[in-house]
Amino acid sequence: MASSSVPPATAPAAAGGPGPGFGFASKTKKKHFVQQKVKVFRAADPLVGVFLWGVAHSINELSQVPPPVMLLPDDFKASSKIKVNNHFFHRENLPSHFKFKEYCPQVFRNLRDRFAIDDHDYLVSLTRSPPSETEGSDGRFLISYDRTLVIKEVSSEDIADMHSNLSNYHQYIVKCHGNTLLPQFLGMYRVSVENEDSYMLVMRNMFSHRLPVHRKYDLKGSLVSREASDKEKVKELPTLKDMDFLNKNQKVYIGEEEKKVFLEKLKRDVEFLVQLKIMDYSLLLGIHDIIRGSEPEEEGPVREEESEWDGDCNLAGPPALVGSYGTSPEGIGGYIHSHRPLGPGEFESFIDVYAIRSAEGAPQKEVYFMGLIDILTQYDAKKKAAHAAKTVKHGAGAEISTVHPEQYAKRFLDFIANIFA
């Protein structure tokens, strides 16, 4: 796209999204909300500001074009770009020169639909208020203001891996009807500010947008070097590992039917990863203590969330959109407020798709959030070299983390099958 001097876009009002009901509900038509322009917040960080400006621009552009009847091979290679030079509008919000690129926009649009996430809700959840910076194992990690989406800064190699596996991933999501423990990839972007490229991957948050997690584990099924460091353990919410899980005699207390469904889904997902020669993935386990969660907490400081951006600064002037599926203006998690209040430990499974409540009569009243993470590592020459080095160090029979994809999968599934009471 040719260079241009343009004002920043505002996000269109939220429209579209899931219908009422609890459990795995399907979308139902509702009355339209009165549309209000949703302002993109003022970002102190130029990178975040450009990213959210770009997402608003992208969703506006997509809204002008009907979804394709079917995706073509070229859709998995496509991208949309915009370059802005000599930008003087709202200089406190955006740098004067920047570029934004969205990878495979029609593919991710289709994936969002298959994961029952409306584009307008996606936009509002990302752009209405500032995302929070949170701790990640590597790279930058942001969480949307409503805690439904995570934005992970990844490497160019990760983007290349995503590109090479995106067609297979999409086919798998179609085949399983979006019912999976894999990460729900919702958008992939490049942001260029001051001649530096940053790559952002947007996913659904595996944890709840309203139930806080009190304990967290990253489980790989390996026992070598799989204990949280002392530095990690003193954090408010440390990421504990396999040895910590065993040493604490931790167990997951869910019903037999839920366990059966979960393990069948996990096995199917892992078999898919083996086909792609992917390994080194983990099961992310978050535990919400219902008793602890029902205790009143002190209110924290109120964040400044007002935007300084004018509501009329629309890129290319697309109109605010009204969808046939009404949602509240708060984004992905917002519609829930129009239904009955949720009690302690209750959740909306249409939003908290990775959640399972503990069984009746379990010794602990808990909610578990379980999903697969770090699924981009393929078994290549680098991994083979690491495996050889670890074999020399620990011996061929040691429970080391770096093994062949088939071995990794078997060890992983065996370990996870034993985390349940």
UniProtKB/Swiss-Prot annotation:
Modification sites for Phosphoserine: 26, 349
Catalytic activity: a 1,2-diacyl-sn-glycero-3-phospho-(1D-myo-inositol-5-phosphate) + ATP = a 1,2-diacyl-sn-glycero-3-phospho-(1D-myo-inositol-4,5-bisphosphate) + ADP + H(+); 1,2-dihexadecanoyl-sn-glycero-3-phospho-(1D-myo-inositol-5-phosphate) + ATP = 1,2-dihexadecanoyl-sn-glycero-3-phospho-(1D-myo-inositol-4,5-bisphosphate) + ADP + H(+); 1,2-dihexadecanoyl-sn-glycero-3-phospho-(1D-myo-inositol-5-phosphate) + GTP = 1,2-dihexadecanoyl-sn-glycero-3-phospho-(1D-myo-inositol-4,5-bisphosphate) + GDP + H(+)
Source domain of life: Eukaryota
PROSITE patterns to which the protein is assigned, alphabetical: PIPK
EC nos: 2.7.1.149
GO CC annotation terms, alphabetical: autophagosome; cytosol; endoplasmic reticulum; nucleoplasm; plasma membrane
Gene Ontology biological process: 1-phosphatidyl-1D-myo-inositol 4,5-bisphosphate biosynthetic process; negative regulation of insulin receptor signaling pathway; positive regulation of autophagosome assembly
Protein name: Phosphatidylinositol 5-phosphate 4-kinase type-2 gamma
Species the sequence originates in: Mus musculus (Mouse)
